[in-house]
Amino acid sequence: MIQQETRLKVADNSGAREVLTIKVLGGSGRKTANIGDIIVCTVKNATPGGVVKKGDVVKAVVVRTKSGVRREDGSYIKFDENACVIIRDDKGPRGTRIFGPVARELREGNFMKIVSLAPEVL
């Protein structure tokens, strides 16, 4: 679960390497985000010449969490790191590539472009 002040790795080539969560979107007083939820972040570490710069405030969707998520069939899926993909207002990714696997739960959130760019969907 991702909450305020959580640092996440960025799993795309938008130029950001690490972001810090400012707010979890979706309802008043919502405290935590899981896979497929949208968060507002600030860029803490970025590569030179990237689309996003250090200090930019961006929206991102969570694609991997250490705490994992329970599926309808009773199975759990967990990852080794917390990671997100920076998105535009139309839910499309800012970058052109996605690194690492993403969870199948992103299909339900209408993030089909991210799912299609990902090398592996678990």
From Swiss-Prot:
The gene is rplN. It comes from Staphylococcus epidermidis (strain ATCC 35984 / DSM 28319 / BCRC 17069 / CCUG 31568 / BM 3577 / RP62A). It holds the Pfam family Ribosomal_L14. Keywords: Ribonucleoprotein, Ribosomal protein, RNA-binding, rRNA-binding. PROSITE patterns: RIBOSOMAL_L14. This is Large ribosomal subunit protein uL14. GO terms for molecular function: large ribosomal subunit rRNA binding; structural constituent of ribosome. Gene3D superfamilies: Ribosomal protein L14. Binds to 23S rRNA. Forms part of two intersubunit bridges in the 70S ribosome. The keyword Ribonucleoprotein applies.
